[in-house]
């Protein structure tokens, strides 16, 4: 009897072992090279998806950048160099695009460079008014007011300065300049790496602009490189904005630019 039970037990053990082998299921953890291979097999599809997405984004960015360069070609000069296709350009007004301001009420260095370039355009007689356009949506943060104060400190008459408090991005500034301030012709002042996109946007929404780009940001190699790279992605948004023709914050019509131009013409006689 004991011998028969022993044979039965052995048979059950063999059957169980065979059953586990037939099922192909192992309860032992995957270790060593097998674990690495298993992880790779899981990650491989994810990596392929990421590469595909990055490729699509790169193609879109390249196409959008080519659009910006094409539309802006022949309409950009570098401030202070006296060269470039738009070197002899004049306009009734210079539009200065906003940028970061500090908590102490001072413009960031790059914004100060833009304002310096605009002040030079005014004092040299190439424009008759300056429109500063920026963001003031957050409490305690007011780009246009800081920009105006800086120009006043540079000796620009307050009567020659107009203010756009709803220039939340470049597209908004361009559309509002045309539809709210009634500007038809302008010089657009920003950093040189930003000019192709900015000029392309403005010209695409019906505003006749030439860009005056400040190149002093190039001395900050890291910042300039990061911003130049960012421009490639921002060009995609620019194309979407132009194609969709979205309406920015508009509000009532403004006459401040026309009044500033008229004041300067009267006092330059």
Residue ranges and their predicted role:
Residues 245-269:
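Short linear elements at protein peripheries
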């Amino acid at each position: 009897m004991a011998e028969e039970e022993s044979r039965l037990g052995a048979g059950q053990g063999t059957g169980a072992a065979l059953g586990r082998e037939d099922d192909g299921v192992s309860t032992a953890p995957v270790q060593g090279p097998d674990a690495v291979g298993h992880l790779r097999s899981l990650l491989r599809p994810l990596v392929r998806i990421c590469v595909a997405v990055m490729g699509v984004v790169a193609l879109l960015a390249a196409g959008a950048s080519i659009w910006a360069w094409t539309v802006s070609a022949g309409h950009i000069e570098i401030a202070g160099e006296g060269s470039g296709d738009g070197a002899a350009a004049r306009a009734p007004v210079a539009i200065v695009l906003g940028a970061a301001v500090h908590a102490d009420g001072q413009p960031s260095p790059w914004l100060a460079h833009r304002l310096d370039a605009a002040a030079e355009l005014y004092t040299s007689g190439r424009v008759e008014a300056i429109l500063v356009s920026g963001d003031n949506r957050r409490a305690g943060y007011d780009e246009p007011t800081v920009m105006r104060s800086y120009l006043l400190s540079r000796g620009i008459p307050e009567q020659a300065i107009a203010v756009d408090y709803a220039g939340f991005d470049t597209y908004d500034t361009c559309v509002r300049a045309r539809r709210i301030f009634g500007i038809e012709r302008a010089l657009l002042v920003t950093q040189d790496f930003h000019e192709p996109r900015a000029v392309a946007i403005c010209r695409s929404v019906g505003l006749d602009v030439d860009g005056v780009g400040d190149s002093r940001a190039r001395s900050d190699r890291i910042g300039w490189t990061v911003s130049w790279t960012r421009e490639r992605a921002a060009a995609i948004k620019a194309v979407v904005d132009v194609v969709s023709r979205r309406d920015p914050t508009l509000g009532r019509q403004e006459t401040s630019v026309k009044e500033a131009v008229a004041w300067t013409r009267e006092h330059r006689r």
